[in-house]
């Protein structure tokens, strides 16, 4: 009996996340988001990187496309190709999807504000593929929560041409901070990325872990939020252009988003 008790205790210590997922009444997993509606693309021109309202997906300064339903390369049988190009160096394309709250693509509008304020844990799980990964300045994967007048942006950036390292975003000072953790996605192969974050009971951002191709790094970074009037949970995917704005494509597949 003692051995059984110790085994149960050990399992509980090793798997706190799984335990929280199965017991939370708010637990929900959205699968294959790369196939779903609600994605909007925005051009971010250097050097200010503010949204360009006059830019067109077919323009010369910066251009972009998003093509779902790709059978090859694919993990699930239906990946989505994201492409950027143009002539203005270091310009980026941001794709955003509103999951919960304002403009929800999932029909989860939470007008009574009973869901978003109770969510504290988020997991961004995605496979990505590139045929010329070296043309990317960086790839960005973000989880965003807006509740109680506070803006929580868990930004994660894999610098590639920019230096093969993970950065995380500082909400208050609006800047990227190096983690010292290497980021070396494999070219011509599927890469599997899992990002885990949390909003603490004291309303702080907690960057928990980054796992790339089975290699997990514990971040344990805590930061303060910014302010907002929004009420929502959203996710971002972004591709950054390099010094020549060389065109390149990234395929996303099995993009799953979990919250509780």
Q: What is the predicted role of each segment?
A:
Residues 76-78, 82-166:
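Secretory/extracellular carbohydrate-interaction modules
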Residues 15-20:
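Sec/Tat signal peptide C-region and signal peptidase I cleavage site
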Residues 168-194:
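Short, aromatic/His-centered strand-loop micro-motif at the edge of beta-sheets
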Residues 126, 189-199, 208-210:
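Short tryptophan-centered beta-strand motifs in secreted/extracellular beta-sheet-rich domains
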Residues 219-253:
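Flexible glycan-contacting loops in extracellular carbohydrate-active proteins
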Residues 1-4:
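Positively charged n-region of N-terminal signal peptides that target proteins for export
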Residues 40-90:
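Extracellular glycan-recognition surfaces and repeat-rich motifs
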Residues 193, 250-257:
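Extracellular beta-strand elements of beta-rich domains used
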């Amino acid at each position: 009996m003692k051995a059984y008790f110790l085994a149960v205790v050990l399992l509980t210590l090793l798997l706190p996340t799984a335990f929280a997922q199965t017991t939370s009444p708010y637990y929900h997993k959205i699968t294959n988001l790369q196939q779903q509606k609600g994605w909007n693309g925005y051009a971010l021109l250097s050097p200010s990187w503010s949204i360009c309202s006059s830019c067109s997906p077919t323009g010369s300064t910066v251009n972009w496309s998003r093509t779902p339903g790709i059978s090859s390369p694919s993990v699930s049988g239906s990946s989505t190709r994201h492409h950027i190009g143009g002539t203005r160096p270091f310009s980026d394309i941001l794709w955003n999807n509103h999951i919960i709250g304002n403009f929800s693509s999932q029909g989860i509008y939470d007008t009574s504000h009973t869901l978003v304020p109770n969510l504290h844990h988020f997991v961004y799980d995605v496979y990505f593929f590139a045929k010329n990964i070296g043309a990317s300045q960086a790839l960005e994967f973000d989880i965003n929560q807006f509740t109680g007048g506070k803006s929580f942006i868990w930004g994660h950036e894999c610098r590639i041409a920019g230096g093969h390292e993970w950065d995380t975003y500082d909400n208050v000072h609006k800047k990227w901070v190096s983690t010292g953790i290497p980021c070396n996605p494999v070219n011509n192969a599927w890469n599997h990325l899992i990002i885990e974050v949390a909003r603490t009971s004291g309303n702080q951002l907690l960057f928990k872990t980054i796992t790339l191709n089975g290699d997990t790094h514990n971040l344990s970074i805590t930061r303060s939020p910014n302010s907002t009037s929004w009420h929502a949970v959203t996710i971002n995917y972004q591709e950054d252009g390099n010094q020549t704005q060389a065109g390149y494509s990234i395929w996303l597949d099995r993009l799953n988003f979990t919250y509780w």
